[in-house]
Amino acid sequence: MIGVFRLESQMLPGNGKFERTGLNSDGKCKEAANTAFNYLKANGNRISGTISTTTKDYIINYQDLQGIGMTEKLALPTLIALCSIALGKPTLSSLAVLGEISIAGTMLKVDELANALQVCLDSGAKKVLLPITSAADLGTAPADLIGCFNLIFYQSAEDAVYNALGVE
């Protein structure tokens, strides 16, 4: 089942700790969140030279808004949340983030794209961040469903962050 999740982030002075709340004991979810933080530590300077993973502590709270269980596809949304708080830039309003990244930044396409878009619509999203690798699957979704969104394609993890934050 496809769900809706909200991430809320906080940044504090510190020494590079990353705390995740709301994931309970789900190891795969924690691993996905850690993937994002490790990616940021290794590649943050490619996003912005002002991001510090050594002098700041980060906290992200994960909320399952529909109570269906937490998704394991948290690396990309976590990376976007971390960059948002680190740069002091909010994400675009009414944005849904689809897709996932690996530790190396490889984009993973969206499973069940038509169903995922329907959940986005039902949840009030107006903009959908989508990996370019899923563009070929748009034919599986009804045209009137696709027409409900401003689709924003990304080609890399950095591109996804820039697009989510509305940075050119």
For every predicted segment, state its role.
Residues 1-168:
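Peripheral, non-AAA+ core regions of ATP-driven protein-machinery
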